[in-house]
From Swiss-Prot:
Gene3D superfamilies: P-loop containing nucleotide triphosphate hydrolases, Signal recognition particle SRP54, nucleotide-binding domain, Signal recognition particle, SRP54 subunit, M-domain. Involved in targeting and insertion of nascent membrane proteins into the cytoplasmic membrane. Binds to the hydrophobic signal sequence of the ribosome-nascent chain (RNC) as it emerges from the ribosomes. The SRP-RNC complex is then targeted to the cytoplasmic membrane where it interacts with the SRP receptor FtsY. It comes from Methanosphaera stadtmanae (strain ATCC 43021 / DSM 3091 / JCM 11832 / MCB-3). The gene is srp54. Transmembrane segments: none annotated. The keyword RNA-binding applies. Belongs to the GTP-binding SRP family. SRP54 subfamily. The lineage of its organism: Archaea, Methanobacteriati, Methanobacteriota, Methanomada group, Methanobacteria. Its EC number is 3.6.5.4. This is Signal recognition particle 54 kDa protein.
């Protein structure tokens, strides 16, 4: 998620942590690095310079807080101002009536339909029953896409691909849903902001649906253009909140987030990948903590809680955090990571690990995961608990037993060693020094 921006800001914080003195010159060096990183992420130039001016002013004029050194104080200011840049923490989506009606809006290509399915999954995790009313008459595949995405969730989709009257579809869909479901999501046709007829239809739909919440889905790859998009929709209907989609790997995601924050539209959720599970409630403090390489243990614990139930799973989470795990632990880890999301994203939640995990460590496809499981099934319990004993003769035996090659065994061992090495620095060492002190200070 925002890999380039995260890497740049993490390096800036490390540079700051390593400074022996903080004066106007060193402060200017730091703010120039921040300016470069944010502008490359398509954050508005005027906004960027305003932010770095605040950082410099506060760093030079504020009284040093008790218990913090000058550089720790500057790091704290950088963190706080970046949090302010992307807005306040929004209120949670409160389902306070039945049915609670949500109208989903967005431009064509924003990822609105997929995001609707993601929101349904999120609501299901919270214990709410949902149904979807599809009123998208412009894209023939919309109804079928929704049906396929939500079928595993056992969520009904009401619609009719043959009916080209969105208002009629909304009325009939709402009538069929009645009050059987906690939440009814109305998926609308993707708009172009210039298409007046569609915007008029959206306003009419809003009158028919009488939504409790109107959610606008904005594509995170469009950068600061998100501002004008949100403003156009806001003029047509009341926007209750915003979901920024496609933040995984987007070079302009920072620009999109800050642009939306400028017009004070609350960002409630963000989409962080292609899977239905790649979706999370937006929390500016947690988000910036991850961007700066400070981790986000709260989100890690929440994600783990969603996919773990047995004691052994919880013990394995401790292994991940401590960096002490065997091949058997790694087998369980990969299973859990596969449920929680891409390993690179999960590792960014662990304080101090941030960008340390090599890029190739995240490229564990389902196919490779299957191969690794076959290889581990060919190992003895002793080998799984003591991977260091696996040398040439054992490699030969394991590969033969699995029907795979020696290179496959070596690939597994290489992945294990890379991951173990990356996790070795976890624990107390990652919470030491200025960065660690700042993390502890932020957790108070």
């Amino acid at each position: 998620m925002l890999e380039g921006l995260s890497e740049s800001l993490t390096q800036t914080m490390k540079k700051l942590a390593g400074m022996s003195i903080i004066d106007k010159k060193t402060l200017k060096d730091v703010t120039k690095d921040i300016q470069r990183a944010l502008i490359q992420s398509d954050v508005n130039v005027k906004v960027v310079f305003g932010l770095t001016k605040k950082i410099e002013k506060r760093a030079l004029e504020e009284e040093l807080p008790k218990g913090l050194s000058p550089k720790e104080h500057v790091m704290r200011i950088v963190y706080q101002e970046l949090v302010n840049l992307i807005g306040e923490k929004p209120e949670e989506l409160k389902i306070n009536r039945k049915p609670y009606k949500i109208m989903m809006l967005g431009l064509q290509g924003s990822g609105k339909t997929t995001t609707t399915a993601k929101l349904v999954k999120h609501l299901k995790k919270k214990g709410h029953t949902s149904a979807i009313v599809c009123t998208d008459t412009w894209r023939p595949a919309a109804y079928e896409q929704l049906r396929q995405l939500t079928e595993p969730l056992d969520v009904p989709v009401f619609g009719d691909p043959e009916n080209k009257d969105a208002i009629d579809l909304a009325k009939k869909g709402l009538e069929k849903c009645g009050s059987k479901y906690d939440v009814i999501l109305v998926d609308t046709a993707g708009r172009h902001k210039e298409e007046k007829d569609l915007l008029d239809e959206m306003a009419e739909l809003s009158q028919i649906v009488q939504p409790d919440e109107v959610i606008l889905v904005i594509d995170g790859t469009i950068g600061q253009q998100a501002r004008s998009q949100a403003e156009t929709f806001k003029k047509t209907t009341d926007i209750g909140s915003i979901i920024v989609s496609k933040l995984d790997g987007s070079a302009k995601g920072g620009g999109a987030l800050s642009a939306v924050a400028e017009i004070r539209a609350p960002i409630k959720f963000i989409g962080t990948g292609e899977r239905v599970d790649d979706f999370e409630a937006f929390d500016p403090e947690r988000f910036i903590s991850r961007l700066l390489g400070m981790g986000d243990l709260d989100t890690l614990i929440e994600k783990a809680a969603e996919v773990t139930s047995e004691k052994s799973d919880k013990e394995m989470i401790d292994s991940i955090i401590s960096g002490k795990f065997t091949l058997k632990d790694m087998e369980n880890q990969l299973e859990m990571m596969n449920k929680m999301g891409p390993i690179q994203q999960i590792m960014k939640l662990i304080p101090g690990l941030g960008n340390q995990l090599p890029a190739n460590a995240s490229k564990v496809t389902e196919e490779k995961l299957g191969m690794y499981k076959i290889l581990m099934n060919s190992m003895t319990t002793y080998e799984l608990e003591n991977p260091e004993v696996i040398k040439k003769s054992r490699i030969n035996r394991i590969s033969r037993g699995a029907g795979l090659t020696n290179d496959d065994v070596k690939d597994l061992l290489k992945y294990y060693n890379v991951t173990k090495k990356a996790l070795k620095g976890m624990g107390k060492r990652n919470m030491s020094g200025p960065m660690g002190k700042l993390m502890r200070h932020m957790q108070r």
